[in-house]
Swiss-Prot record:
InterPro entries: ZFP36-like (IPR045877), Znf_CCCH (IPR000571), Znf_CCCH_sf (IPR036855). Induction: The zygotic transcript but not the maternal transcript is moderately induced by forskolin and tetradecanoyl phorbol acetate. Keywords: DNA-binding, Metal-binding, Nucleus, Repeat, Zinc, Zinc-finger. Residues 205-295 are annotated as: Disordered. The keyword Repeat applies. GO terms for biological process: 3'-UTR-mediated mRNA destabilization; negative regulation of gene expression; positive regulation of nuclear-transcribed mRNA catabolic process, deadenylation-dependent decay; regulatory ncRNA-mediated post-transcriptional gene silencing. This is Protein TIS11. It is found in: Nucleus. A zinc finger (C3H1-type) spans 135-163, 173-201. Residues 205-250 have a biased composition (Low complexity). GO terms for molecular function: DNA binding; mRNA 3'-UTR AU-rich region binding; mRNA 3'-UTR binding; zinc ion binding. PROSITE patterns: ZF_C3H1. The lineage of its organism: Eukaryota, Metazoa, Ecdysozoa, Arthropoda, Hexapoda. Gene3D superfamilies: Zinc finger, CCCH-type.
Length: 436
């Protein structure tokens, strides 16, 4: 719209049109114009002009638009308009209800959280959150150490005392090098959890922990090796004891037979002294006697010594009554085997190490492996026999294991078993001397 007043006059029925912007004024002038006052008309025209000037100023201040916006109106039925209004009102009513529900659920959730914090025992973790087992029970529980109680109880992931504290699997180089940050700046952000050494106390503590760990590992290894070595030895000793008992019974029962005498004359019996020595382990180095032990299942204490002495005594009495017949009795105990002929009562004492010829040992068993720590003990074979005739030939064999080292042969005390044997042999020797 232009700012000027457009005045159009059209002579038609003596009428004039005045157009000004959006405001129009129709003035009719006819022959009865004399009835109206001209001054009032002029005043109205001036007011209209002033109003138009104000409108022009307002249009100049606002952004100028050359064309007005094109708008189209589409008529809709009144029912659709009412339905839309009702739906809009329902949505507005539902929105506050949903908001109130959300606030209620949030409040309930906060209440549950507060209840969980107030409980003395925590609930079990859901299966979706796995527990970190690498740090489980590796640190002491501070509330338990300070107050003596913990609200989590047995489900606490920290140790309630030193007995529950577990060792952490550290890197081999843990706490073996100095912390560059601590020694250059004087501060380390990791603090006591740093993997490097901050002072000498930490290094000493780490060395002590490593030494204790290595000692426990060595002890466990030695126990395992000793248990492994003990199982085959016990089995072999039981087999040897059963074999020796059967041989002693068979030889003692056939004392009066001539065939057994001829077969046993001039023969030597080699019986194994002890179970084969295994390769040296930690347990072998610690014990001065090698594989010998005083356990009730070992072969050293499971042989009948008194039965052997009784068989020898009966054989000597048989020699007095019948000098032409010979009998052989063999008894094995603690790896000791002996064969006796007629009239050789003194041979028993010599065979047990108490005779005139001194101690003697049989040759080495072929089952004994060579050990780098315990070398095979020396063995000597002494065969002594005196004939009461051409058919009486006595052969004996003394089995005795030497001490693990030559230097300990004189210092090591004798076992109680040998003391009992020596006392029994002395009594038997005195009886045989009196009988002869």
């Amino acid at each position: 719209m232009s700012a000027d007043i457009l005045q159009k006059s059209r002579e038609q029925d003596d009428s004039h049109y005045f157009e000004r912007g959006d405001i129009s004024k129709y003035v009719t002038m006819n022959d009865h114009l004399g009835d109206f006052d001209c001054n009032e008309v002029r005043k109205e025209i001036r007011m209209l002009l002033a109003h138009g000037a104000n409108l022009d100023q307002q249009h100049q201040q606002q952004p100028h638009r050359h064309h007005g916006g094109l708008t189209r109106t589409i008529s809709q039925p009144a029912q659709l308009i009412q339905q839309q209004q009702q739906q809009h009102q329902q949505q507005q009513q539902q929105q506050p209800a949903v908001a109130s529900l959300v606030t209620i659920t949030e409040n309930l959730g906060n209440m549950n959280l507060h209840r969980k914090l107030e409980r003395t025992q925590s609930e079990p973790l859901p299966p979706q959150q796995p527990m970190n087992t690498s740090r489980y029970k590796t640190e002491l529980c501070r509330p338990f150490e300070e107050a003596g109680e913990c609200k989590y109880g047995e489900k606490c992931q920290f140790a309630h005392g030193s007995h529950e504290l577990r060792n952490v699997h550290r890197h081999p180089k843990y706490k073996t090098e100095y912390c560059r940050t601590f020694h250059s700046v004087g501060f380390c952000p990791y603090g006591p959890r740093c993997h490097f050494v901050h002072n000498a106390d930490e290094a000493r503590a780490q060395q002590a922990a490593q030494a204790a760990k290595s000692s426990t590992q060595s002890q466990s290894q030695s126990q395992q090796s000793s248990s492994q070595n003990f199982s085959p030895k016990s089995n072999q000793s039981s087999n040897q004891s059963s074999n020796s008992s059967s041989s002693s019974s068979s030889s003692g029962g056939g004392g009066g037979g001539g065939n057994s005498i001829n077969n046993n004359n001039g023969s030597q019996f080699y019986l194994p002294l002890s179970p084969p020595l295994s390769m040296s382990t930690g347990s072998d180095r610690e014990s001065p006697t090698g594989s010998l032990s005083l356990s009730p299942t070992n072969s050293l204490t499971s042989f009948p010594f008194h039965d052997a002495l009784q068989h020898g005594y009966l054989a000597s009495n048989g020699a007095k009554s019948n000098s032409s017949a010979s009998s052989t009795s063999s008894a094995s105990g603690m790896g000791l085997g002996m064969s006796m002929g007629i009239g050789q009562g003194m041979i028993i004492g010599q065979g047990l190490g108490m005779g005139h010829h001194g101690p003697a040992t049989p040759p080495e068993s072929p089952n004994v492996p060579i050990s780098p720590v315990h070398t095979p003990p020396p063995y000597d074979v002494v065969v002594s026999g005196s004939g009461a005739g051409n058919n009486s030939v006595g052969s004996k064999q003394l089995l005795q294991k030497s001490v693990s080292t030559p230097m300990q042969q004189e210092d090591t005390p004798r076992l109680p078993v040998f003391n009992r044997l020596s006392s029994g042999v002395e009594a038997y020797q005195q009886q045989s001397n009196l009988g002869l």
